[in-house]
Amino acid sequence: MSKPDLNSLSIKMKQINLLKERFSHTIEVVKDSTFKIPFLNVHLLISLPVNFPNSPPAYFLEILQTHQPVSLPPNYQWTQISNLASVTVHIMEPFIKDSRILETLIEQVKRSQAMQQQQQQQQQQQRNQQAQQQYSPPPPYKDQPINKQPAQQQPQPVQQKPQQQQNGTNKIPMIPTEFPELKSKSVEELEELLKNEDSLNAFIYSYDEVSELSNRKSKLLSENERLTKITDPLPNDINDLSANLMTSKQKLEELKRKQEQLQQKKNSIADKYSQQNLLEILNDSISDLESESDNIVHSFLEGNLELKEFKKQFKEKRSSYHSKCANKDLFFK
């Protein structure tokens, strides 16, 4: 490297260091080439040409995913000994003194984007209308009467889905397709940018859209990890619950069998001591007592029983007989 090149490189590095000291929040997008400074809710992009400081830097305002060029102060002549930090301050001064300048520029960008969006919608509507005009109803069936004209089918209007708002929380940000700051780079600088992975990543992540996508990815990964921690124990819990369910089912079946046995025993006892059975038993007992008392009388008349024994047995049987007859009368009351 020649002495003039070394001198230019030394001046360039000194200018960059002064810029970083003056603006502590400077983001180095591409090493020693492209820088981004947060400024009034936007970003001021500084692109250094290959032959800097012999050639002036290029300034851009990063507004709504676009890069708006900013000219150097009027009547300002850039020289090799010009101070990059001071020029950057001069670039910022008009916007700081009068915030309406930046607001006007933002409104212009919004109007431009709105017009582009409107043009795209109009083109889409035209394409839809052309598709409707080209539509024709199918021919009538052959067996349809000739004198009856087929009703002309009205084409159904194509319903367009409402476009999501640009600032919708669920809308995925668009990756920028144009990189104006790369146009001022030489082939050597571009090759160096491609070879240096850190510089390339810094340049890519300097775009808010890429950063937002990266943040969304990190949030989704964190959410997946959280859900994984919740769902991983679920199979074991399900197996345990299934085992408990089977045990409870077996216990239930055993209890059902016992309940059926007890129910059968209950029905048997209920049938045995039902009113009908009790009445039949009572009638049989009354009949037996009456028959036994008659037999005692016959035995006494035939001389087989003494008077004293006859009185005792006959009285006992008749007392039981009348007692059960009384119970039978009470049963029907």
From Swiss-Prot:
It is a peripheral membrane protein. It holds the Pfam family Mod_r. Signal peptide: none annotated. Residues 256-333 form the VPS37 C-terminal domain. Residues 116-134, 144-166 have a biased composition (Low complexity). It is found in: Cytoplasm; Endosome; Late endosome membrane. Its main location: cytoplasm. The keyword Nuclease does not apply. GO terms for cellular component: ESCRT I complex; late endosome membrane. Belongs to the VPS37 family. Component of the ESCRT-I complex, a regulator of vesicular trafficking process. Component of the ESCRT-I complex (endosomal sorting complex required for transport I). This is Vacuolar protein sorting-associated protein 37. It comes from Dictyostelium discoideum (Social amoeba). The lineage of its organism: Eukaryota, Amoebozoa, Evosea, Eumycetozoa, Dictyostelia. The gene is vps37.
